[in-house]
């Protein structure tokens, strides 16, 4: 998918400023109490998602996250298909006071072992 220059600049800034968690660490972090938060649209979530993950679409994140995850100290692993929406969501959560918000580097595709073909796939901050 081709993104607009402004959208990609926002996503790149989020990727640079929020920690990307390697997919090999996701299951361990979730087992230790982290919440995997699927921020894709409901239709995407219904097709596939990380087992046990919560769902809150990116478009409703700011309105619904406080009811869904009231603890500002909670470790939250935002994810989408690749990187952009996950990183943008983690950045938004940090602005809202969720200091342990991160994103899953490579998103669901990487978690499932699929190659990340997004243009910023090699820019993930670990």
Q: Where are the predicted features?
A:
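Rhodanese-like catalytic fold shared by cysteine-dependent sulfurtransferases
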Residues: 1-35, 42-75, 81-126
């Amino acid at each position: 998918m081709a993104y607009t220059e402004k959208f990609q600049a926002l996503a790149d800034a989020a990727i640079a400023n929020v920690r990307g968690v390697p997919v090999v660490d996701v299951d361990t972090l979730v087992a230790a109490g982290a919440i995997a938060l699927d921020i894709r649209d409901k239709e995407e979530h219904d097709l596939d998602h990380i087992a046990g993950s919560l769902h809150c679409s990116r478009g409703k994140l700011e309105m619904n996250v406080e009811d869904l995850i009231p603890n500002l100290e909670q470790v939250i692993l935002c994810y989408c298909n690749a990187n952009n929406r996950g990183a943008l969501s983690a950045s938004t959560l940090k602005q809202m006071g969720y200091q342990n918000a991160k994103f899953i580097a490579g998103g669901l595709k990487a978690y499932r072992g699929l190659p990340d073909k997004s243009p910023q796939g090699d820019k993930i901050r670990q």
